Amino acid sequence: MVHATACSEIIRAEVAELLGVRADALHPGANLVGQGLDSIRMMSLVGRWRRKGIAVDFATLAATPTIEAWSQLVSAGTGVAPTAVAAPGDAGLSQEGEPFPVAPMQHAMWVGRHDHQQLGGVAGHLYVEFDGARVDPDRLRAAATRLALRHPMLRVQFLPDGTQRIPPAAGSRDFPISVADLRHVAPDVVDQRLAGIRDAKSHQQLDGAVFELALTLLPGERTRLHVDLDMQAADAMSYRILLADLAALYDGREPPALGYTYREYRQAIEAEETLPQPVRDADRDWWAQRIPQLPDPPALPTRAGGERDRRRSTRRWHWLDPQTRDALFARARARGITPAMTLAAAFANVLARWSASSRFLLNLPLFSRQALHPDVDLLVGDFTSSLLLDVDLTGARTAAARAQAVQEALRTAAGHSAYPGLSVLRDLSRHRGTQVLAPVVFTSALGLGDLFCPDVTEQFGTPGWIISQGPQVLLDAQVTEFDGGVLVNWDVREGVFAPGVIDAMFTHQVDELLRLAAGDDAWDAPSPSALPAAQRAVRAALNGRTAAPSTEALHDGFFRQAQQQPDAPAVFASSGDLSYAQLRDQASAVAAALRAAGLRVGDTVAVLGPKTGEQVAAVLGILAAGGVYLPIGVDQPRDRAERILATGSVNLALVCGPPCQVRVPVPTLLLADVLAAAPAEFVPGPSDPTALAYVLFTSGSTGEPKGVEVAHDAAMNTVETFIRHFELGAADRWLALATLECDMSVLDIFAALRSGGAIVVVDEAQRRDPDAWARLIDTYEVTALNFMPGWLDMLLEVGGGRLSSLRAVAVGGDWVRPDLARRLQVQAPSARFAGLGGATETAVHATIFEVQDAANLPPDWASVPYGVPFPNNACRVVADSGDDCPDWVAGELWVSGRGIARGYRGRPELTAERFVEHDGRTWYRTGDLARYWHDGTLEFVGRADHRVKISGYRVELGEIEAALQRLPGVHAAAATVLPGGSDVLAAAVCVDDAGVTAESIRQQLADLVPAHMIPRHVTLLDRIPFTDSGKIDRAEVGALLAAEVERSGDRSAPYAAPRTVLQRALRRIVADILGRANDAVGVHDDFFALGGDSVLATQVVAGIRRWLDSPSLMVADMFAARTIAALAQLLTGREANADRLELVAEVYLEIANMTSADVMAALDPIEQPAQPAFKPWVKRFTGTDKPGAVLVFPHAGGAAAAYRWLAKSLVANDVDTFVVQYPQRADRRSHPAADSIEALALELFEAGDWHLTAPLTLFGHCMGAIVAFEFARLAERNGVPVRALWASSGQAPSTVAASGPLPTADRDVLADMVDLGGTDPVLLEDEEFVELLVPAVKADYRALSGYSCPPDVRIRANIHAVGGNRDHRISREMLTSWETHTSGRFTLSHFDGGHFYLNDHLDAVARMVSADVR
């Protein structure tokens, strides 16, 4: 154990070095945070001490940040052995040019940049422009050339298998720098050209390069230096090093020589990873316990669609000057908060205000270079890792509380940082069965020094433009030291976000920082609203709209109309039509009877029975008598109806129609008896608009119905607004479809009669028959509808030409789909269409949005918006914290004003919960989720009670339905979770395009929502079921979907076995890499749901490329395909000869099932043994007993197995085929190589009695064509007939000697094979493969190098030259030279492809050869 006093001095010196101060300036008992130590430096200390074998963790150090406390911790923790690191030795030089592993962050960038990835399609990219003067192009080029030699990572190449290599330096070649000379160009043209350069470079993916410099020469000796870096090659700290070195080299100063390379660093880290890692393992276990509870990333408001580029990034920035920075950090340190966490907390606060939840995952990159060599800090490369913070700001109402919460989250996560954030994300993805991203990033570069050192700005000028972006990153908030202060900037994919969101968020963060810097009180004061003043003003203006109330009760307008126009029609019904006078008389009769039965003012009367025209008189009579009506329809189950009667405190009951079966515990009147009795005199008393008018019972979340009490004045606000908005009058006729229990009936009755119009009653027998509705509209020339969306959908299905009389159609109560407006316009061109929002508690409706141009509604609209509040009403969208949500942020819709209910009958607790006081007024909490648009329009986005948990994600079913309805061909959708305790999403969809399928819907949906929001099951229905009240019947939808899934036997996507050899091979590769049994991986199972991630996907792709000869496969394809079935389809679709893949897969499966000894003994699978007249290494593929055969000669290094597929294609054409095996490979590996081509040909000729198979057709590829030519000469001299020689991609014999020497070194031989295109670079990583390949190729090259043939040497056989039209080695002219070597017929043919065109055209070539044989 280290002595505590000595330890204290050591720690003091290390901390002083990090802070850049004298050791004696640090008091052992002082809080180090207060003296400038931040979390980044603290984490570097942890890493440094752990590598020395000292058992410390970040959380413990952060809890007691003093030298005294740390000395005790360190001295107590020195018993752990330091981590051993393998010495790289001279590997950096001896293996120059060889591939080496990428770092985890490099791999993430490499995978994420592919188009098929979520938030992919972009590179990790940093682009900076320096505006300076007199930068010299030649000096810059010379400096850049030396820079590229100094830092090999500037030459790095990222290979398709997910590794990287640094090719040898290109000798004296200068680093390429493009120079644009605009010194003599007009100013406006200069601006245009500079803008064009910026536009092109700022978001480019560098092709084949990772570092690019360009210089623009400007008038007045000004210059602009454009610096572009692919951050897959170099991290942010490396960028500082690059520019500092470039500036020094430009100035003629040589930086100190480097004795270490990034390649060596990565090799050392990889070696360390292979050793036992007890700290990492413990941290992995710690994270594993928390994976199920980790939150989602921030759910920020995104753009539904539009033309904006969703890949391009924009920047927001603010510079905190030194005074502001010092004040802010001093106040933070006084509270024990580090500067980095102060800035992080301000960012987290913004995320919480604009996100769906105040708890979320935040991604923190860490810059950590392990001190493996003194030069590590001078290297360029990727040294980053990441940390995931579980940030929870719930209840953190002050800046101090938020900062403490974020700092505590950092301490907790950093205490387990040996298991990096990328690994945690992969584990989280496995747990949830879908890819999980952490696309919101906070990058702190505090403590790394100024972004651009003075030398850089002195040489190249001031940075005038900076932008960065990264794959799978939406928003990167960065803080860095700059120009003596702190630069706070965001690089953000603005096209993804809703308009105005990023500006508002960034402004709020800056305001927060300035507020905290300005005074201590701000830290502990309640936080100001996040609602920008401009947005508040828009809402205040809309909420402030008023209209003078009439001060009348609901029925007053009717009685006035009855006096003014007694003979006008009031009701059209199957039970009989009524004029206003007749209806007034019936209403008076009802009122008189109720009074006679003991009704007092304010008493409640239940109205029971089926829907009829007489009910209009019933409710008018109840209200005229001073009563309150409470309807109970015939659809109510008896038990529920009786509970409503009891809860509703009913005093009397009025039964419309026959006596009901419900037990009514109060005096009851039959409406028929009342209307049949002699008229009784009734004199209405004065009405009270503040009195209750009706009680409507709606469903309760507890299963107990709740009765909503609505006063006359509240309902009158809706009635008066409706009449005023649509300018309704005596000429209008209303179709009254809603039952009395439905609040829509309030408008059907009272708005119609108050305006002097007539009601066309849909009675009980007709209310489920949309064709009957259309007949009524047509017959009575109905002009006004007040409908639920489901009703209008059904009506438009059958409307035909019967709806043209409509002029005012209002739809509300559920999602109002835009297609309803479009379809209505076709059938009723004169109709005005409005969507309304509200609830029974808001007196039917509270908001309105009139569609002005139904034919041109935005295609991304999922629903018609709620719109704006009615006059005298006000709305709020409220977060869980109780604060107003900014524009585009979803929250609960609150409604206040004249048009809200009084509460719930007999439920004071529920009333207090849903009707709340705020700012001196009562607000109703609707439970609807809504958001504001920038113009104050409210959009309905779902119901709070429709939120579900899927794979750990919180999912809003309404968002899925909205996305479905945006798809072409889909006009209705409903999503649900299948019953039975599962978290399986399903959706019912109605389509109007026969070409739309369930699978195409799922595929298209992937462009709109994350994978976890794509329903596993999609069922196409003719119609979405609706309740009688016109809302989606979600219970019925769930039952239908569950029945369909049960019927198809596909509830949980059970195991599906492979059906083809290729699928079997793919399953074997995938299962091996996932560590699963073969039968545990079905062909329709999602790779990532089985536990796959980007790293394992890379391994799968490497395996497929290696074993199935599929070099075109990329990691992005795994993310696009996701299942074995889809992957097999993708691979087959890319093959010109699909059978080839099946053959390759068959060979792979044979090998995969062998032992290693079996593999070595059977590297060349033999179709059948040759006849005894031939050597065993002559492979025969029997096709026919007819005379004549094809003899195949492989290419240099090629084994007989490589031509198995050609042989099988020839056999399929009824041709007997032989393939010869050269020595030094496969089963002839121990045979000595031939000294020359002639000797090889002689050995092959003597390998069998070729007279038995004559006449022969010879086929040779590349070198094999030369061997075949010499074989033909031997055959003809020995009387063996040769019909033809097919020379495939081979030089003519007379041209070989003039071609120059062939490579001899192993490295050059391999490079030559790759260049020819016949050897996948991935295979060269396999040492066993290389060990088998190189000796064979070198033996063949030696034989070929000594070959020479005069141009006049000919054979009698015909020669057919064949090649690929894109073969860069064997040109058309070289193939034509074969003509000089035959005295017979010569032909020349080309196929599309390169040197190994044959792989893509096996069948076509086999047919050509076979036709010649026969």
UniProtKB/Swiss-Prot annotation:
The modification O-(pantetheine 4'-phosphoryl)serine is found at S39, S1094. Its EC number is 6.3.2.-. Residues 96-394 are annotated as: Condensation/cyclization. It comes from the Bacteria. Residues 579-975 are annotated as: Adenylation. It is an enzyme of class 6 (ligase). This is Phenyloxazoline synthase MbtB. The lineage of its organism: Bacteria, Bacillati, Actinomycetota, Actinomycetes, Mycobacteriales.
